[in-house]
From Swiss-Prot:
Major location category of this protein: membrane
Region described as Disordered: spans on this chain: 479-498
Cellular localization per UniProt: Cell membrane
Gene Ontology molecular function: any one: ammonium channel activity
Stimuli inducing this protein: By nitrogen deprivation. Highest expression at the end of the light period.
Organism encoding this protein: Arabidopsis thaliana
Function: Ammonium transporter probably involved in ammonium uptake from the soil. Contributes with AMT1-1 to the overall ammonium uptake capacity in roots under nitrogen-deficiency conditions.
Sites bearing Phosphoserine, chain numbering: 487
Record key words, sorted: Ammonia transport, Cell membrane, Membrane, Phosphoprotein, Transmembrane, Transmembrane helix, Transport
Protein name per Swiss-Prot or TrEMBL: Ammonium transporter 1 member 3
Phosphothreonine: modified positions: 464
Matches recorded under Pfam families: Ammonium_transp
Keyword set includes Plastid: no
Protein family according to the UniProt entry: Belongs to the ammonia transporter channel (TC 1.A.11.2) family.
Length: 498
């Protein structure tokens, strides 16, 4: 704990006279005991804060489940819900066995960790069980992102394989590069050993979590191909509407709530005073991070609302929800190191990026039921670039440790080195995830383990794979959920049963 009490006989000699040594030993011993109590209390408070943040991040799994369920057709609800449960369950086991060691095991050459497999020799002087739990919650978030991209057409065994591989190997390697003190691009390395003298700044994971999940989903959806009926023979897009906007909104609010553990919780400690003043410390940085997260998401939501209104002619709640989440995904990298006004810029541009990526996806006939690759991959990449433009020198030194001459945001007068490091991060994440997850999805396809049959896809996986529908009554998915691109109304005039 900073500001520890110090005491010695020499300090007290002028006050205690002839008996200075004996009295000083006693007094210093008592003060040492008090100091240890304060240190223990600070450690307990920091761990409690981290555990609370881990619980919030884990609650995002419920948000992902609701968002996914509402975004697919009713006939595939049980399937997508089960995959979300297994993302957490399989991810928990594989992150325990391998993932944490690869990510934070230490003693590496900058590429991958080599210790603490199955939490052996754990806890360590630098990490307790609360840190493992927090990082596991992050790992399964990446897997949850990917599941949305390949929804409604993927074999169940493929989910198990890709989720285990992603959380046990692919994601941990990336998190080691940028978050471990040993990582080759980490900002926590010694000053003279950092990438471009700064390291890549990805505070809570626009790249490490969102881009990894989004790029993995991109390859899965590309290799599988679009859902049946998503595009007509002439290339005209047909929107396959999700069956419940209510679940989408519920999932969005749960994710919003969890993001206050995702971003502010990434400080991992709260009782860290800064040198700027006794009443100013990490608790202030945590508050600023929460405010920046809020402003970016809100700005992206409103920008998407009016942008989509101009493009489609109607107000669409699911588009607004995706815009909100895109703003959150983008600010995640720089939430701790930018001013609140910059977070508004981040959210505005995140909405523009998301809308643009969705237009491009339609042009190339790319089908992603939850827009996960566009939202998490595209907005995550923008978030990394945003840091290179708007990161503030003062906040970088507070969050990552004071370093004379540390590069900071280009638009803030800090030169282009940080932006260069951010671009390198984007490139290596795209390359690594493409090489690993793209190869895995290709192998699964060649082994006929990736996509379900056309008959099962048309009938719905709930009936053909999971023993029955999620609801006693459900809509006729093939008709009522097919929507002309320019209309908010389904083709079928038959009202849905409830």
């Amino acid at each position: 704990m900073s500001g520890a009490i110090t005491c010695s006989a020499a300090d007290l000699a002028t006050l205690l006279g002839p008996n200075a040594t004996a009295a000083a030993d006693y007094i210093c011993g008592q003060l040492g005991t008090v100091n240890n109590k304060f240190t223990d209390a600070a450690f307990a408070i920091d761990n409690t804060y981290l555990l609370f943040s881990a619980y919030l991040v884990f609650a995002m799994q419920l948000g992902f489940a609701m968002l996914c369920a509402g975004s697919v057709r009713a006939k595939n609800t049980m399937n997508i819900m089960l995959t979300n449960v297994l993302d957490a369950a399989a991810g928990g086991l594989f992150y325990y066995l391998f993932g944490y060691a690869f990510a934070f095991g230490g003693s590496s050459e900058g590429f991958i960790g080599r210790h603490n497999f199955a939490l052996r020799d754990f806890p360590t002087p630098t990490a307790d069980y609360s840190f493992f739990l927090y990082q596991w919650a992050f790992a399964i978030a990446a897997a949850g992102i990917t599941s949305g991209s390949i929804a409604e057409r993927t074999q169940f065994v493929a989910y198990l394989i890709y989720s285990s591989f992603l959380t046990g190997f692919v994601y941990p390697v990336v998190s080691h590069w940028f978050w471990s003190p040993d990582g080759w691009a980490s900002p926590f390395r010694s000053a003279d050993d950092r990438l471009f003298s700064t390291g890549a700044i990805d505070f809570a994971g626009s790249g490490v979590v969102h881009m990894v999940g989004g790029i993995a989903g991109l390859w899965g959806a590309l290799i599988e191909g679009p859902r049946r009926g998503r595009f007509e023979k002439g290339g005209r897009a047909i929107a396959l509407r999700g069956h419940s906007a209510s679940l989408v909104v519920l999932g969005t609010f749960l994710l919003w709530f969890g993001w206050y553990g995702f971003n502010p919780g990434s400080f991992t400690k709260i009782l860290v005073p800064y040198n700027s003043g006794s009443n100013y410390g990490q608790w202030s940085g945590i508050g600023r991070t929460a405010v920046n997260t809020t402003l970016s998401g809100c700005t992206a939501a409103l920008t998407t609302l009016f942008g989509k209104r101009l493009l489609s002619g109607h107000w669409n709640v699911t588009d607004v929800c995706n815009g909100l989440l895109g703003g959150f995904a983008a600010i995640t990298a720089g939430c701790s190191v930018v001013e609140p006004w910059a977070a508004i810029v981040c959210g505005f541009m995140a909405s523009v990026v998301l809308i643009g990526c969705n237009k491009l996806a339609e042009l190339v006939q790319y089908d992603d039921p939850l827009e996960a690759a566009q939202l998490h991959g595209g907005c995550g990449a923008w978030g990394l670039i945003f840091v290179g433009l708007f990161a503030k020198e003062k906040y970088l030194n507070e969050v990552y440790g004071a370093t004379p001459g540390r590069p900071y945001g280009l638009f803030m007068g800090g030169g282009g080195k940080l932006l260069g490091a951010q671009l390198v991060q984007i490139l290596v994440i795209v390359g690594w995830v493409s090489a690993t997850m793209g190869t895995l999805f290709f192998i699964l396809k060649r082994l006929n383990l990736l996509r379900i049959s056309e008959q099962h896809e048309m009938q719905g996986m709930d009936m053909t794979r999971h023993g029955g529908f999620a609801y006693i009554y459900h809509d006729n998915d093939d008709e009522s959920h097919r929507v002309d691109p320019g209309s908010p109304f389904p083709r079928s005039a038959t009202p849905p049963r409830v």
